[in-house]
Amino acid sequence: MGCPNCGSTTFESDTASGNTYCTQCGVVVEQDAIVSEVTFGEASTGAAVVQGSLVSNDQTHARTFGGPYRNQGSVESRELTIANGRRRISALAIALKLNERHIEAAVRYFTLAINNNFIKGRRSQYVVASCLYIVCRISKTSHMLIDFSDILQINVFKLGSTFLKLCRVLRPNLPLLDPSLYISRFASLLEFGPETHRVANDAIRLVARMNRDWMQIGRRPAGICGACLLIAARMNNFRRSVREVVHVVKVADITIQKRLDEFKLTESGDLSIADFRNIWLEGQSDPPSFTKNQKFQQYGAQKVSNIDHTQEYMSPIKRTPDFDGNEVKSEELSQTVKVESQETPVHLKADEREIRKEVTETLKGDELRKISLQVNVKFSEEEVTLEDVDDDEIEDILLDKDEILTKTQVWMELNKDYLAEEEAKNLKLQEDLKKGIVRQPRKRRRYRPRDSTSDGIADTAAESAKEMMQQRAFSKKINYEALDMLFDEEQS
């Protein structure tokens, strides 16, 4: 660098003022130079003190000490928010047994959320859990969103909503969920003992087969894992009920049953255990939604064809032929009916009245009522059988005896408090009846809106006031006749 005035390259610097000037012409080349080196000074007590301040990468200004005391530095609210977020993330990561690298990555996502003003109006634990779950998804760990809600004791649906909104703001490149990541975790919770690894391998093979048959896309990974673990347990002679699997994978039992029904319709579902372990089918089945849609289309086409077939044999008769085979014209028919109606004798009308009277008396009698009761009792005593139903949806709804017993036990367990209260009420009512205490049910009065068509509407204000006083009966000392005279005087 040369002097801008004379071009000389000889300079001298004054460290006290921070200026640099040319020795030939005296022009100041630099002034107020900032020195980045660390300097030390001496305090009044003789201790060495570092001069200057440190500005980190996430700060907007240096911390200043506002007095002779050491711990009076000002801290920004943003720094305080990041520090609190780091503390919450560390506590949650320790509970989930995550590493330090997961904590640092989650803190970076939390800082990005602060920069985008995402934390305003939201609880910090939802944002912290969402940031840490993003890191778990990217790192492909076996943690699920419901694990975070169990630890933090928060609603999993609200947490999922916050996670989706954070993904829309930050747009992280999240991989698709692979159900095989959760197989080992769920298998260890089902306690297969030394056969855990073997069961997990069979379940992972089942997951790959379901993915090949288009059963994994668009489905919750927990439901796929539950169905695969249930099949793998049966393949290795372990008796695990659907309720035990539901308790581990935390999905509904009907979800696992649907996955099992869908797998049963594939080609792999027809293989034996040895063939499934040794043979890998190269083909793939149609997606379950496609197969279901085909069934609906076939059912609709069959229904339309049945309607068309019925209409062919039941075409409407436009004209009425006579006995000789000749068609009767509509004009002649109307004239004939008109003449017959005019020539109807009087005694036929009287007979018709007598017939109507007899029918009415028969309908009002007790014999018809007894016959109807006998028919109703007969139909109520008959057992309803639905074995001949060929509808797939109704067959899925119907339960067998074991399922009915299980569902009854579940219902009794859930409603045992209500049943106990009802039993206590019945016992108390029986004791009151034995003691002669009879409590009649209180009838509610039905208040109907009154209009001009209602009965008992007062014509004048005096009558209305009189009716109100008689109905309410505020006092027996009121002279109702004086009320009539009072209103008469006002009207006059």
Curated annotation (Swiss-Prot):
Residues holding Zn(2+): 3, 6, 22, 25
GO cellular-component term (any): transcription preinitiation complex
Residue span of region Disordered: 440-468
Positions annotated as zinc finger (TFIIB-type): 1-30
GO biological process: DNA-templated transcription initiation; RNA polymerase III preinitiation complex assembly; transcription by RNA polymerase III; transcription initiation at RNA polymerase III promoter
Gene3D superfamilies: 2.20.25.10, Cyclin-like (1.10.472.10), Single helix bin (1.20.5.650)
InterPro entries: BRF1_TBP-bd_dom, Cyclin-like_dom, Cyclin-like_sf, TFIIB, TFIIB_cyclin, Znf_TFIIB
CDD domains, per database record: CYCLIN_TFIIIB90_rpt1, CYCLIN_TFIIIB90_rpt2
Main function: General activator of RNA polymerase III transcription.
Protein name in UniProt: Transcription factor IIIB 60 kDa subunit
Organism: Schizosaccharomyces pombe (strain 972 / ATCC 24843) (Fission yeast)
